């Protein structure tokens, strides 16, 4: 499988989320490189990084949706929970000695692209409108800046 390339149709129009999605794609490419170089320890590190980062990303995304009053936030959160469970199962299989790199990378790339193009695009307009309104009311970063700092340092 070749390296993944960011495509314009993956942009949802919320810069911070688009940057996080790009970072996840970079991680998937690191997984490919680690696997190709037969570095099992590096593969494990990337898997851990993907799980940890996506959990933070999901929590951030869910908070944005909740703040914006997105009506399908609970359903979107369930999709995230199922994804985390699935990836955690891959991590356990890897820790048990199984070579899951190809299977995991294929699943992650398909899931991520489909999730961004479908589920994430669905909330984007409502969240953008909320962020724009909030920015007009609270010049200087406010809630978004605090939330970014809380999740990503």
From Swiss-Prot:
Domain of life: Bacteria
UniProt keyword Metal-binding, yes or no: yes
Keywords: Iron, Metal-binding, Oxygen transport, Transport
Residues making up the signal peptide according to the UniProt record: none
Entry binding sites for Fe cation 2: 61, 76, 80, 115, 120
GO molecular function: iron ion binding; oxygen carrier activity
Pfam families referenced in this protein's UniProt entry, alphabetically: Hemerythrin
Quaternary organization: Monomer.
Family: Belongs to the hemerythrin family.
Stored PANTHER family: BACTERIOHEMERYTHRIN
Protein name stated in the entry: Bacteriohemerythrin
Native source species: Stenotrophomonas maltophilia (strain K279a)
């Amino acid at each position: 499988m070749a390296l993944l390339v960011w495509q314009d149709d993956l942009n949802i129009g919320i810069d911070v989320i688009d940057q996080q999605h790009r970072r996840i794609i970079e991680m998937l490419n690191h997984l490919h490189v680690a696997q190709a170089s037969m570095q099992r320890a590096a593969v494990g590190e990337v898997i851990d990084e993907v799980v940890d980062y996506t959990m933070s990303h999901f929590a951030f995304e869910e908070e944005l949706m909740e703040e914006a009053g997105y009506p399908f936030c609970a359903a979107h959160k369930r999709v995230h929970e199922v994804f985390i469970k699935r990836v955690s199962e891959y991590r356990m299989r890897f820790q048990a000695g199984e070579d899951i790199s190809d299977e995991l990378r294929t699943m992650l790339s398909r899931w991520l692209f489909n999730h961004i193009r479908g589920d994430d695009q669905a909330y984007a307009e409502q969240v953008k409108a909320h962020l724009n309104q909030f920015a007009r009311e609270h010049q200087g970063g406010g809630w978004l800046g605090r939330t970014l700092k809380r999740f990503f340092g």
